[in-house]
Amino acid sequence: MIEIKDKQLTGLRFIDLFAGLGGFRLALESCGAECVYSNEWDKYAQEVYEMNFGEKPEGDITQVNEKTIPDHDILCAGFPCQAFSISGKQKGFEDSRGTLFFDIARIVREKKPKVVFMENVKNFASHDNGNTLEVVKNTMNELDYSFHAKVLNALDYGIPQKRERIYMICFRNDLNIQNFQFPKPFELNTFVKDLLLPDSEVEHLVIDRKDLVMTNQEIEQTTPKTVRLGIVGKGGQGERIYSTRGIAITLSAYGGGIFAKTGGYLVNGKTRKLHPRECARVMGYPDSYKVHPSTSQAYKQFGNSVVINVLQYIAYNIGSSLNFKPY
């Protein structure tokens, strides 16, 4: 994550729904806002959230009475992506998870925050021929909010990972916010090699397989792309080896193969997957962030997480708009 000196959200309160690891919380707190409520149903995510923020999020959002939620200025929600992910079953609103958006809507209707800040998978934009996004947009408009949506890629905002997500920003209409802009992309100058742990800490991750085939030479220059160098086995999604002079593949909560969830990388002549701490760095989490002690849970959690830096840039621009200062 980046250091933000100009705290655009100072004095504002927010709630953290579908909180996961607390990525939204890190981003908004870095801009000066205060978290007054968190909600997350997964017990392992609750554990790591409490380890880092000293509070256990409330559980099942469908059972929460919206009237009991504290007043707030910004509602944050990276609502579940499994229902909309290309690697999932693509049911969306027909799946019970899909209807969790309506729990967001009923809280918005009751509490009327100034801003609603949502995140979802890229596929959300095209899901069900665009109807899913249309339902969200129409619902927010009915509740008297504007609706801004854009797909942004983490690699355009300082993070060496191809991770495209849709970000949805809604301002309450009576605020008459006309000047909101999504952050402008900039050239990447950090690559996977810059985020690696010392070899001595990751020796247990090294894979030595007889069916390892290197198909390409290591590259000399860094590049804002994934660069495949080789494969093991049949070369399926979790069996590919990449250069650390490029960017990381999209971290995933699911998938199989020897390098499942992170991809394989050629590091100082050896092949391995990423360490959970390296996954944290590739998502913008600071090294002060405590990772779940279960390695399998940690990989899953970062595969499901939000990218801190992208949220920080958006949060800053939200604050700029509320403070009537164009970015």
UniProtKB/Swiss-Prot annotation:
Q: What GO molecular function annotations does the UniProt record carry, in alphabetical order?
A: DNA (cytosine-5-)-methyltransferase activity; DNA binding
Lineage, top-rank taxon, reads Bacteria
Q: What outcome is documented for mutating C81S in this protein?
A: Cells grow as well as wild-type, loss of methyltransferase activity, DNA affinity is about the same as wild-type
Q: Which Pfam families match?
A: DNA_methylase
Q: Which reaction does it catalyse?
A: a 2'-deoxycytidine in DNA + S-adenosyl-L-methionine = a 5-methyl-2'-deoxycytidine in DNA + S-adenosyl-L-homocysteine + H(+)
Q: Which part of the chain is the SAM-dependent MTase C5-type domain? A: 12-325
Q: Which residues form the active site?
A: C81
Question: What EC number is given for this enzyme?
Answer: 2.1.1.37
Which Gene3D superfamilies does the entry mention?
A: DNA Methylase, subunit A, domain 2, Vaccinia Virus protein VP39
Keywords linked to the UniProt accession: DNA-binding, Methyltransferase, Restriction system, S-adenosyl-L-methionine, Transferase
Tell me the subunit arrangement: Monomer.
NCBIfam families for the chain: dcm
The protein's name = Type II methyltransferase M.HhaI
Give the species this sequence originates from: Haemophilus parahaemolyticus
In the record, what lineage is assigned to the organism producing the protein? Bacteria, Pseudomonadati, Pseudomonadota, Gammaproteobacteria, Pasteurellales
